[in-house]
């Protein structure tokens, strides 16, 4: 099924509706075949929940929220897609308008309420968001986890990261047999709150179970390597980041992270420069990568080349203090 691993867009809802169609037409084995191609770690909420239903033979759950033979359900989906588009453009008012129409036509599709909660969250209407999140109880395990994460994010906004992570870790500890997606998310939450030791603990739990053929392992090694780097354990950081590049040698962000780490340590400058040239060739309009290669030229005292890249980085990201500091240092060296 070509849409599952298609890198050119998010086809998760189409995959959900195809699985729904197969089940509705009693083509269970075909639905299982599609589900077996999905991975919890890199699937959307809707597909993760769908995979869980298929894996646990809860096929009736699909028909409870959507029917391919119901015209209202179909029209509702088109309206939801329009709403989602406006939400991605942060036009919350228009998004809510189409979302209300969608929910009116198909109130059964309770899982679509995640977009309602997201819109309230983006609008800083946290109490309204929390009321919507109550729709997701434990029978929808992935949506229940979404609820807990969003509640933790709201607490973080109100009271800071420490309160937010305390809430999420408390809820996480009560989940029996958390799946790898939940472990991945809690690791990311710890990393974002700068509790790198705990993040490493959970990343390691997942990494040890993954085969090198899975690209998601490359991402996990990148995240764990970044955590080691923040702790100053450069040996383990370098091991993880190089292992990540062994799996996916064309990941511009891993190339940039490892190279910039080496630059900061005044370590393997020439090799770091080659990695940055490759990263820049892959992502020439990324401000962080552009800044990194400019700073690499600065460190080898090629200030003319450095100025060219850092100037572009400033244009791409004018408010960033680090980029502006780098630009100031280069202009000083050039007596400008």
Predicted regions and their residues:
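TPR-adjacent "capping" and linker segments in tetratricopeptide-repeat scaffold/adaptor proteins
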Residues: 4-6, 63-78, 211-218
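Structural marker of alpha-solenoid helical repeat scaffolds
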Residues: 6-7, 41, 105, 136-140, ...
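Residue-level recognition of tetratricopeptide repeat
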Residues: 11, 20, 44-45, 75, 84, 109, 118, 153, ...
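TPR alpha-solenoid repeat register
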Residues: 14, 47-48, 78, 112, ...
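Register position in tetratricopeptide repeats
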Residues: 24, 88, 122-123, 157, ...
């Amino acid at each position: 099924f070509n849409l599952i691993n298609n890198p050119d867009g998010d086809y998760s809802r189409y995959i959900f509706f195809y699985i729904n169609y197969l089940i509705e037409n009693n083509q269970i084995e075909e639905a299982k075949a599609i589900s077996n191609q999905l991975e919890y770690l890199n699937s959307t909420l809707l597909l993760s929940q769908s995979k869980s239903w298929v894996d646990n033979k809860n096929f009736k759950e699909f028909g409870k929220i959507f029917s391919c033979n119901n015209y209202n359900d179909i029209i509702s989906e088109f309206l939801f897609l329009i709403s989602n588009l406006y939400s991605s453009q942060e036009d919350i008012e228009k998004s809510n308008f189409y979302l209300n129409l969608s929910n009116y036509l198909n109130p059964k599709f309770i899982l679509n309420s995640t977009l309602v909660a997201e819109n309230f969250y983006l609008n800083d209407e946290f109490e309204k968001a929390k009321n919507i999140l109550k729709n997701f109880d434990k029978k929808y395990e992935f949506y229940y986890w979404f609820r807990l994460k969003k509640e933790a994010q709201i607490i973080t906004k109100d009271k800071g990261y420490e309160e937010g992570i305390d809430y999420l870790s408390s809820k996480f500890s009560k989940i029996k047999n958390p799946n790898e997606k939940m472990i991945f998310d809690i690791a990311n939450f710890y990393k974002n709150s700068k509790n790198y030791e705990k993040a490493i603990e959970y990343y390691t739990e997942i990494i040890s179970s993954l085969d090198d053929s899975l690209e998601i392992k490359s991402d996990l090694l990148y995240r764990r390597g970044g955590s080691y780097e923040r702790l100053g354990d450069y040996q383990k950081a370098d091991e993880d980041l190089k292992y990540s590049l062994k799996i996916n040698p064309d990941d511009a962000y891993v190339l940039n992270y490892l190279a910039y780490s080496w630059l900061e340590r005044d370590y393997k400058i020439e090799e770091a420069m080659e990695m940055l040239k490759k990263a820049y060739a892959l992502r020439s309009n990324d401000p962080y990568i552009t800044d990194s290669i400019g700073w690499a030229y600065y460190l080898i005292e090629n200030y003319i080349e450095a100025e060219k890249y850092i100037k572009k980085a400033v244009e791409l990201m004018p408010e960033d203090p680090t980029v502006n500091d780098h630009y100031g240092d280069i202009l000083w060296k050039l007596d400008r």
